[in-house]
């Protein structure tokens, strides 16, 4: 009954605490059904008290800022029908069914739609989450972060950033032609095929980069696109975890701003986990290496798995959380499963399972 009709849009576009709202009875009923509102009795006359707290709980479970304000994003999520959420859970379980058991004592897992990374440790047969933080992933429209797994092998302090050719041609070169001063401002340098730094800024060097005869590299420093630490798990797509000079973006609800690599909110905490088997690498030493301004790479004694995953339904502390299907992978998987089921039904066969890259 709580979903027989959609919640109406607030009169001013946003429902603020203390305001009146025609949809309060339906909102209360819906939040009770979802388990976010535990109060009994008649709905309040105004949007206040326990109802605001229930909306905050709902927002927290759906990747939204828990401010209690019912704006466009919160209203959209509140109007999602239960059958859609059930399907999200089914798709999450389907993906989990494919996931191999990792024979490792440690692992890092990034969940793209959740914009979160978690680091796990296995002790005495029990899995313990040691670190969890927000991340920024690849832009959904242009540069999606791929789904894969690899082994963490290196940590690079004060890294150089070698501007990928696609970014150089599509973004960096056009800007440098418009704003030559941007070259020194960002700490760029030209590097030849032999790895040597080639002079300063010149139009000839820009043309050489365009032809693929040179590359642009950003020196370590405060403006470096990778921040002051990079976590390397070699893979064909050259995806890695790294810090960022623009931490303010972590305040956003939706965080798909990168060119594909994954930016981490708390690099020191992640470094402490990654280097836990290196007793000489204390937090103080990590911070010093990050601030040194001179690139240095450390090879890990024991590589361990890094999994870049994709699921829009997650259980945290016994509560289900849902996230938008930012890359459309749920829709692709849903369509594939339904088509397969229809095909098997038509042929009289029983479905055993299906695996997909989504």
What spans do the regions from the language model cover?
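Well-ordered beta-sheet/strand-loop patches within structured domains
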Residues: 1-358
